[in-house]
C-alpha cells in the first residue's frame, strides 16, 4: 500500500507541474504580456508539453522495465525541476521561451509510464485494475494546477506557482529515493531497447489499447488543457471561473478512474469501456450545440468527464489482464504516448476551427464521431482479443495442473 501511495503522489506532483502552463494561457492572451496572441497561439502553448510528455513515455516506459520505478521516479521528478524553475524565473518574458521550456516541461508527463509497471508488479492480476486505477487518479494533479496557478500568479507573483511546484518536486524526489522499493522478483528484460520496442508494438493489445486510450485519456487531457480557453471564449467566463470549472471536470474524471479499474476487475473491461464511449458520443453531440452552461452544458461535460475517467482506468485494466508483466512498462509507454497525443491534437483542431468559423461545433462533433467508431472497435476487435487472452490463460493453467499431477 505504501508503494501505491508513493507512486500516486509522484504521479500527481509531476502532473501538477505538467499542467502549469494551461491555466495561464487565457490569462496571457488577456493581459497582453506576451503581445497579441491568437487562439491558435494559446492552443500551441498549452499543447507542446502534452506532446513531449506523450512521446517521452515510450523511452521512459522501456527504461522503467530495465531500471525500475525506484530509480526512475526520482530521476524524472528532479529533471522536471529545471524547466519549472526556468518558466518561473525568466521565461515568461517571451512566447518563444515559454514554448522552449514548455517543451522540456513535457518530461513531467512521462511519470505515468514509470508508475504503471511499478504498481502493476506489486499486485496480483485480479487486483491490478483497481490498483492501476488508484494510481491513475494521480492525474488529479492537473486539478491542483487549475485551482492554484492563477490565484498564486495574481495574488503572490508570476514566479510563485512555479517555485512552489519545484520545491515539492525536490521533496518528493528525495522521499521516493528513500522509501520506494521495486517489487520482489523484478527482472530486467533481455534485448536492446529497439528490439523490445518492436516486439511490444507488434502485440495486438498494444495498438488496440493505443486507440482506446487516445480517445479516453486523450479526451481528458484535451479538455483539461483547453477547457479554460474554451469556456472563456464560448461562455465569456473569467479566467478564474473557467479554471474552477475545469478543476471540477478533472475531479470527476479522477474519481471515476479507479472506479473504472474496479468495475473492470468485477465485470471485465469491455462493458466499462463501451458504456464510457457511448456517453461521450451523446455528451459531445450535446455540447456541440453550445447549450446553456448552467444546466445542460454542465451535465454534458461532467458526464463526459466521468466516462473519460472510467475509460482510462478500464484501458489499463485491459492491458494488465492481457500483457505479460515483463512487457507492461514497454506497452504502457506506447499506450501512454497514444493517450497523450490524443490530447495534443484536439486543442489544435479546436483552435483552428474556431479561428475560421467562430464555433466549436465541428470540433465537438468530430469527438462524437470518433467515440462512436471507438465504441464499435471495443465491442468487436477488443472483445475478441480479451477472449483469446482468457482462453490462453485457461489453457496454460490446465497444462500446469496436468504437469503437476504427472509429477
What do the predicted segments below correspond to?
Residues 101-138:
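Cytoplasmic helix-loop-helix junction between adjacent transmembrane helices
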Residues 134-180:
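Helix-loop-helix hairpin linking two adjacent transmembrane segments in secondary transporters
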Residues 183-210:
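Juxtamembrane intracellular "pre-TM" segments in multi-pass secondary transporters
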Residues 78-92, 278-292:
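C-terminal ends and interior cores of transmembrane alpha-helices
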Residues 44-61, 247-259:
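Central cavity-lining transmembrane alpha-helices of secondary-active solute carriers
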Residues 96-110, 296-310:
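Hydrophobic core of transmembrane alpha-helices in multi-pass small-molecule transporters
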Residues 21-23, 205-255:
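Extracytoplasmic gate region of multi-pass secondary transporters
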Amino acid at each position: 500500500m505504501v508503494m501505491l501511495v508513493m507512486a500516486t503522489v509522484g504521479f500527481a506532483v509531476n502532473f501538477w507541474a505538467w499542467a502549469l502552463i494551461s491555466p495561464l494561457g487565457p490569462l496571457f492572451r488577456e493581459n497582453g504580456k506576451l503581445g497579441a496572441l491568437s487562439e491558435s497561439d494559446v492552443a500551441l502553448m498549452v499543447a507542446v508539453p502534452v506532446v513531449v510528455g506523450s512521446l517521452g513515455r515510450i523511452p521512459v516506459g522501456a527504461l522503467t522495465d530495465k531500471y525500475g520505478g525506484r530509480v526512475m521516479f526520482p530521476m524524472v521528478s528532479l529533471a522536471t525541476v529545471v524547466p519549472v524553475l526556468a518558466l518561473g524565473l525568466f521565461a515568461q518574458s517571451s512566447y518563444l521561451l515559454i514554448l522552449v521550456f514548455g517543451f522540456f516541461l513535457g518530461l513531467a508527463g512521462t511519470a505515468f509510464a514509470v508508475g504503471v509497471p511499478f504498481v502493476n508488479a506489486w499486485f496480483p492480476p485480479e487486483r491490478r485494475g483497481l490498483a492501476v486505477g488508484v494510481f491513475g487518479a494521480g492525474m488529479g494533479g492537473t486539478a491542483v494546477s487549475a485551482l492554484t496557478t492563477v490565484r498564486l500568479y495574481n495574488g503572490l507573483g508570476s514566479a510563485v506557482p512555479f517555485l512552489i511546484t519545484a520545491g515539492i518536486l525536490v521533496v518528493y524526489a528525495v522521499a521516493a529515493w528513500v522509501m520506494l522499493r521495486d517489487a520482489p522478483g523484478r527482472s530486467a528484460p533481455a534485448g536492446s531497447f529497439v528490439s523490445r520496442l518492436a516486439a511490444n508494438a507488434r502485440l495486438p493489445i498494444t495498438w488496440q489499447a493505443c486507440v482506446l486510450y487516445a480517445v479516453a485519456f486523450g479526451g481528458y487531457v484535451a479538455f483539461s488543457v483547453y477547457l479554460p480557453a474554451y469556456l472563456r471564449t464560448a461562455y465569456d467566463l473569467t479566467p478564474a471561473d473557467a479554471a474552477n470549472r475545469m478543476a471540477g471536470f478533472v475531479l470527476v474524471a479522477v474519481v471515476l478512474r479507479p472506479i473504472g479499474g474496479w468495475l473492470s476487475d468485477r465485470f471485465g473491461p469491455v462493458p466499462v469501456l463501451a458504456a464510457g464511449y457511448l456517453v461521450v458520443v451523446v455528451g459531445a453531440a450535446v455540447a456541440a450545440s453550445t447549450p446553456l452552461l448552467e444546466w445542460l452544458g454542465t451535465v454534458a461535460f461532467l458526464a463526459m468527464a466521468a466516462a473519460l475517467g472510467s475509460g482510462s482506468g478500464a484501458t489499463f485494466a485491459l492491458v494488465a489482464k492481457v500483457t505479460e508483466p515483463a512487457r507492461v512498462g514497454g506497452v504502457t509507454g506506447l499506450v501512454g504516448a497514444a493517450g497523450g497525443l490524443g490530447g495534443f491534437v484536439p486543442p489544435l483542431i479546436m483552435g483552428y476551427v474556431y479561428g475560421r468559423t467562430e464555433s466549436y461545433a465541428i470540433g465537438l462533433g468530430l469527438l462524437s464521431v470518433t467515440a462512436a467508431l471507438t465504441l464499435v472497435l471495443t465491442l468487436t476487435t477488443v472483445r475478441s482479443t480479451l477472449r483469446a487472452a482468457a482462453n490462453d490463460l485457461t489453457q496454460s493453467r490446465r497444462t500446469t495442473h496436468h504437469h503437476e499431477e504427472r509429477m
